[in-house]
């Protein structure tokens, strides 16, 4: 039975024999002693395996190359080398899988662009090993947070007939013959399709999540979402993961309070439970990352009305690339100026103009704004977007009519307001944006295992 390297280094007893397995990061020989850097993915540094010339294991050294997979049995001993407390003195080595000089991940620095081309191998690198361990632990932390706060986990559908955001950026799901689909009045007849109507991959689980919040009070979804948005930017991908909580009997203030508690928790979790990875990111990816994340974990989260945000941006004297006017959405440059220069920390922007927000957001008494909020943080700007949902059936129907949104496809959503409706609120947090923020990585393609972007669906 093999021992995980991370557990061996933290719990192993010096002088005892252990069996480990992993992949060779590097091999060097000095004065008749071989030093193998072996990593099984459980930690950043792996472990140093020492093979002395008189050991039977030394006979395998000539066949070992970077990238090989090995099984090693040996004695755990104190290490005289700097930077490591213990190492494994090998007694036997078995080569499980061979490698050669053509292995793409030789011991040198590779660009992120190159590593994207070998996404099937990049998890073996230090940087991406750290990224995906952090991603895994954060996913576990998200479930722990909501479980500890009595939220129900809901699996919302991947295939849907609704477009929550109303942007028409759905990937279509169809079994019709693309070359000769059945036609109705000259157009494809989706009534003959698998589901009997147009369907696509979900852009959000929010609408379905609301239905469960109106039965279980507090729920959350955490799953993949899809946007057929032809954007080749470091912040956009066609497939990504979203965390979307919904709370019944809650207003915008409750929504912001939950978002603040959630972000604080995740920042503290990363600092405390992923300390090795976070220290690596601070050294290799973004100097000062630890302090930046620590400040967010400890800061006061300012609440600022959209009206005030516009006024303060206009008074700043800064010439922005995008105009600053009431009624226009804030761009990333505006968001970052607010959080980095005006506030100097996290900030909620509250109550946006209704004309730039979605139909489901609750109209405020002024009929000019809706109960919407964005959480802005230094370095990235918006990281969370949310709102109080419109619970009044007549107001919701009027808003849909105003925007030309058909009622029939959303009959079930409207019916939820007919019986036992109540104030409710929720928000969305893009999981990849969270991983980028906590790791310092600057491209979404580098925080998801196999990125899906325009004209790229390999692996």
From Swiss-Prot:
Keywords: Aminoacyl-tRNA synthetase, ATP-binding, Cytoplasm, Ligase, Nucleotide-binding, Protein biosynthesis. It catalyses: tRNA(Asn) + L-asparagine + ATP = L-asparaginyl-tRNA(Asn) + AMP + diphosphate + H(+). GO terms for biological process: asparaginyl-tRNA aminoacylation. It is an enzyme of class 6 (ligase). Its main location: cytoplasm. Homodimer. This is Asparagine--tRNA ligase. It comes from Pelobacter propionicus (strain DSM 2379 / NBRC 103807 / OttBd1).
């Amino acid at each position: 039975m093999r021992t995980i390297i991370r557990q061996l280094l933290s719990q192993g007893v010096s002088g005892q024999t252990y069996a480990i397995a992993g992949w060779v990061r590097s091999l060097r020989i000095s004065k008749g002693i071989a030093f193998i850097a072996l990593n099984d993915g459980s930690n950043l540094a792996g472990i140093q395996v020492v093979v002395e010339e008189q050991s039977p294991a030394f006979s395998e050294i000539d066949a070992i190359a970077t990238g090989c997979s090995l099984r090693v049995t040996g004695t755990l001993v104190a290490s005289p080398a700097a930077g490591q407390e213990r190492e494994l003195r090998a007694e036997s080595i078995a080569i499980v899988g061979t490698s050669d000089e053509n292995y793409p991940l030789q011991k040198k620095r590779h660009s992120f662009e190159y590593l994207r081309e070998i996404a099937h191998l990049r998890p073996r690198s230090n940087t991406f090993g750290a990224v995906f361990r952090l991603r895994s632990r954060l996913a576990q932390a998200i479930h722990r947070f909501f479980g500890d706060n009595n939220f129900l986990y809901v699996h919302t559908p991947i295939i849907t007939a609704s477009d929550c955001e109303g942007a028409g950026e759905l990937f279509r799901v169809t079994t019709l013959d693309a070359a000769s689909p059945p036609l109705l009045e000259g157009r494809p007849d989706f009534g003959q399709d698998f589901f009997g109507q147009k369907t696509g991959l979900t852009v959000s689980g929010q609408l379905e999540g609301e239905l469960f919040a109106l039965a279980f009070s507090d729920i959350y979804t955490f799953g993949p979402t899809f946007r057929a948005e032809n954007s080749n930017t470091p912040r956009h991908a066609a497939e990504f993961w979203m965390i979307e909580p919904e709370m019944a009997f809650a207003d915008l203030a409750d929504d912001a309070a939950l978002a603040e508690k959630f972000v604080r928790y995740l920042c503290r979790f990363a600092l405390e439970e992923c300390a090795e990875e976070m220290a690596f990111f601070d050294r290799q990816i973004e100097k000062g990352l630890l302090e930046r994340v620590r400040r967010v974990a400890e800061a006061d989260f300012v609440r600022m009305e959209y009206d005030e945000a516009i006024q303060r941006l206009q008074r700043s004297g800064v010439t922005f690339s995008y105009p600053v006017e009431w009624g226009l959405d804030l761009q990333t440059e505006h968001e970052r100026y607010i959080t980095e220069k005006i506030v100097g920390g996290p900030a909620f922007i509250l109550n946006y103009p209704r004309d730039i927000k979605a139909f489901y957001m609750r109209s405020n008494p002024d009929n000019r704004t809706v109960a919407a909020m964005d959480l802005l943080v230094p370095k990235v700007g918006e990281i969370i977007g949310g709102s109080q949902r419109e619970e009044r059936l007549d107001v919701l129907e009027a808003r849909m009519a105003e925007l030309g949104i058909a009622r029939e496809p959303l009959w079930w959503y409207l019916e939820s307001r007919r019986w036992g409706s109540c104030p409710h609120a929720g928000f969305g947090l893009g999981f990849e944006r969270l991983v980028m923020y906590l790791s310092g990585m600057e491209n979404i393609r580098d925080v998801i295992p196999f990125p899906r972007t325009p004209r790229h669906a390999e692996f």
